[in-house]
C-alpha cells in the first residue's frame, strides 16, 4: 500500500519552500517568487530559497540539517512515459529525475507533506504509478499534493496559498484542499488590481506583475488539476 493511515497535526511543522522563476531553456515562472514569499512570510513558519538557492545540493543540505515536515517545490516538471530518467522536476541548475526522489531521504526525518507546485506531478503510467507523487510516497512521504495536467503559475499561486491558509485553520490535508478549491470556484481567490485576494486577506503583488493579464481563477483549469495522494489526514 502507498498509504500509511494515521493523523498528525501539521500546524507545528516547518515548511521548506524552494523554487525557480528563471530558466535557460524553459518559459519563466514570474509568480513563483510571490508564492514562496507569501507561504513562508505570511502563512507558515519556514524557509524559502529561490533560483540559485534551489539546487539539489542545497535541498539535500536543508533536509539533513533541519527538520522540515513540509517540503514545497514550485517549478517546471515533466512526466514522460517510459524510462524514469526521462521525467524530471527542474531545479536551478539540474533536473531531479523521477528515480532520484528516493535518494533525498524524505523519510529520515519524515516529511509529512510534499507539495509539488508544478505540471503533471501526479501523472503516471504502469511503471511509475502516480508519477512523482507515487514515487514520493514510496520514498517515505506521508502525503503529496500534486497535479494531473499542465498548470499556470498564477493558478498554482492562488491554490497553494489558499491551501496553506485553510490548512492552518483545519489541519486535515484533504479538507484544506477541498476548501481551497471551493474558495477558487466561488471567486474568493482572485488576482485583480495588482493584488492577490484570498478568502480572508489580500497580498500586494510586485509592480512588474501589474501588466500581466489576470485570469479567471474560478475556471476548473486553474484549480481542478490539484489532487492529494497518500494519507488524506
Model-predicted regions and their roles:
Residues 10, 65, 106-110, 137-139, ...:
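A structural signal for short secondary-structure junctions
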Amino acid at each position: 500500500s502507498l498509504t500509511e493511515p494515521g493523523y498528525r497535526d501539521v500546524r507545528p511543522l516547518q515548511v521548506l519552500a524552494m523554487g525557480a522563476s528563471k530558466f535557460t531553456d524553459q518559459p519563466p515562472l514570474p509568480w513563483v517568487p510571490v508564492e514562496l514569499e507569501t507561504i513562508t512570510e505570511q502563512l507558515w513558519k519556514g524557509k524559502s530559497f529561490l533560483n540559485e538557492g534551489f539546487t539539489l545540493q542545497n535541498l539535500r543540505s536543508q533536509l539533513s540539517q533541519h527538520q522540515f515536515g513540509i517540503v514545497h517545490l514550485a517549478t517546471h516538471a515533466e512526466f514522460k512515459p517510459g524510462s524514469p530518467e526521462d521525467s524530471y522536476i527542474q531545479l536551478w541548475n539540474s533536473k531531479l529525475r523521477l528515480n532520484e526522489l528516493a535518494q533525498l531521504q524524505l523519510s529520515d526525518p519524515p516529511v509529512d507533506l510534499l507539495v509539488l507546485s508544478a505540471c503533471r506531478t501526479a501523472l503516471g503510467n504502469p511503471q511509475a504509478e502516480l508519477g512523482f507523487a507515487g514515487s514520493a510516497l514510496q520514498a517515505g512521504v506521508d502525503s503529496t499534493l500534486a497535479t494531473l495536467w499542465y498548470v499556470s503559475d498564477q493558478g498554482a499561486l492562488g491554490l497553494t496559498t489558499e491551501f496553506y491558509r485553510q490548512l492552518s485553520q483545519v489541519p486535515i490535508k484533504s479538507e484544506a484542499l477541498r476548501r481551497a478549491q471551493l474558495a477558487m470556484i466561488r471567486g474568493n481567490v482572485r488576482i485583480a488590481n495588482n493584488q492577490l485576494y484570498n478568502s480572508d486577506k489580500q497580498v500586494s503583488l510586485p509592480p512588474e506583475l501589474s501588466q500581466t493579464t489576470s485570469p479567471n481563477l474560478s475556471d476548473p483549469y486553474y484549480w481542478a488539476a490539484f489532487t492529494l495522494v497518500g494519507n488524506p489526514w
